[in-house]
Structures are given as structure tokens and as C-alpha cells.
């Protein structure tokens, strides 16, 4: 199988192809999750494994599972694991609704697809496993509750128009939304293009809305915060 590699900030190689690649949202979610050095972490719908590989690149050495329903994505993740010697990462080819494990995770992440209605176009057929009709926000929250430790966190990113659905799905599965952060491309943009949500299993009812995260500075380059996110190491606690 053909692939190319992308190099992360600290030298980790990520194998990608036309179907399984990554964007800014994966970078933001991997940082937002705040995974600590030895915590157990699961990424649902991991694609090429970018989120666990970013954690590895920034120093995470706890148990990390990259779960992907498409075998091609799992294969790419395994290639990246071998290239980097990232032995703490396990690539799993499975449907999260059926997958069982004895591990209780500290953190679960999910970077879901953003189209939710209608049939995928012909050129999207290969990516149909990423389509929202195969995995709903409720499915993710239900699986996260089953797999998280008490007070463990589920972190997701979604389009802002889906925020109400994400919150409802979390609450229906006893995951309490604790932190919300909107992402704007530029300071003067009226509408954010992404929202990050952190929910805690059996958490208390309090919610913090963080200041907007701005991607670009006034000159069109990355903002200072984005540059910090791209280069920030995991705290070894």
C-alpha cells in the first residue's frame, strides 16, 4: 500500500494517504485533551493515528489506543508505530460499539466526521466509514462512559452547529460537559468554525467557557497560541 509521511514537531513520522490524512482540528483536539505522561488514552475513529502519534511526539508514554473501523487506517497507524518505535501505541481495527477491553481509560478523544446527512459522494465512498451515519455523538458518549475511569474525560471537536447534540449525548450518558472552547480562524470572524468540548464521567454540574482560540494572527500567520500548541511538550506528572 502506498503512503507518504508527514513529520511532526519533534520528529515523529505519520504515514498518510489520500483517504487517511489530518488537519488542524486533530492538532487542536490532541492538545485540548491534556493527556498526561503515563495516562491511558483512547482515540476513537483514529484514522491514520494522528492524535496518539501527536501525544507520542510530545512525550506521552502511557497506554494509547488508536481505534479505527477501517483496516487501511489501522495499517497506516501500525506503519507509523514501527517507523517511530512507538511501542506504547496500539492500533486496533474495530467498531467502538462492539469493542471490549479491560482497560479503564483516563482520557477518550474523538474527532468525528463533519457531514451528517445525505449519501456520500462517489469520491467519498472510500471514506464512508467516517460518515456520521456509522457513528453518532450518542454512540461515542455511550462508549466513552463504558471505557472511562470515574471522572475520566471525553474530549471531542465538532462543528458549532452540532454543539447541542454533543452536550445532549454526553448528558444522556452521564458525562457532564465541563469545558467548551470555540475556535475562530481570525479574531474578526463572526462565526467560529470548530468547538472543543471536555466532559467528565459522573462529573459535577459546572461549565467553563474558555476564550475563543484564534488560529491566525493579523498578518495571516499562526497566532502565538497556535504556535505554542504545535510545540508544547506533555507535562511529565
Show where each model-derived region lies.
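Conserved Class I SAM-dependent methyltransferase catalytic core
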Residues: 19-22, 136-192
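Conserved class I S-adenosyl-L-methionine
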Residues: 38-45
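Conserved SAM-binding loop of SAM-dependent methyltransferases across substrates and taxa
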Residues: 48-61
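SAM/dcSAM-binding transferase cores
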Residues: 188-237
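A short acidic, Gly/Pro-enriched loop at the edge of an enzyme's catalytic core
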Residues: 100-108
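Conserved SAM-binding loop
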Residues: 77-78
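Conserved SAM-binding motif I beta-strand of class I
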Residues: 63-68
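Mobile active-site "lid"/loop adjacent to the S-adenosyl-L-methionine
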Residues: 112-139, 143
Amino acid at each position: 500500500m502506498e503512503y507518504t509521511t508527514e513529520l511532526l514537531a519533534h520528529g515523529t513520522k505519520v504515514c498518510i494517504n489520500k483517504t487517511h490524512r489530518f488537519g488542524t482540528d486533530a492538532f487542536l483536539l490532541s492538545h485540548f485533551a491534556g493527556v498526561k505522561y503515563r495516562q491511558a488514552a483512547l482515540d476513537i475513529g483514529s484514522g491514520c493515528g494522528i492524535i496518539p502519534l501527536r501525544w507520542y511526539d510530545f512525550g506521552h508514554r502511557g497506554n494509547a489506543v488508536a481505534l479505527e473501523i477501517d483496516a487501511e487506517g489501522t495499517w497506516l497507524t501500525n506503519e507509523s508505530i514501527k517507523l517511530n518505535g512507538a511501542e506504547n501505541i496500539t492500533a486496533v481495527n474495530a467498531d467502538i460499539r462492539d469493542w471490549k477491553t479491560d482497560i479503564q481509560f483516563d482520557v477518550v478523544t474523538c474527532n468525528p466526521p463533519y457531514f451528517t446527512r445525505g449519501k456520500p459522494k462517489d469520491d467519498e465512498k472510500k471514506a464512508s466509514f467516517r460518515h456520521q451515519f456509522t457513528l453518532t455523538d450518542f454512540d461515542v458518549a455511550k462508549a466513552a462512559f463504558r471505557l472511562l475511569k470515574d471522572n475520566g474525560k471525553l474530549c471531542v471537536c465538532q462543528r458549532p452547529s452540532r454543539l447541542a447534540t454533543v452536550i445532549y449525548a454526553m448528558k444522556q450518558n452521564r458525562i457532564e460537559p465541563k469545558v467548551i472552547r470555540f475556535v475562530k480562524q481570525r479574531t474578526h470572524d463572526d462565526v467560529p468554525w470548530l468547538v472543543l468540548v471536555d466532559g467528565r464521567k459522573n462529573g459535577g454540574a459546572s461549565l467553563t467557557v474558555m476564550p475563543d482560540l484564534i488560529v491566525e494572527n493579523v498578518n495571516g500567520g499562526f497566532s502565538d497560541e497556535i504556535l505554542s500548541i504545535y510545540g508544547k511538550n506533555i507535562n511529565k506528572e
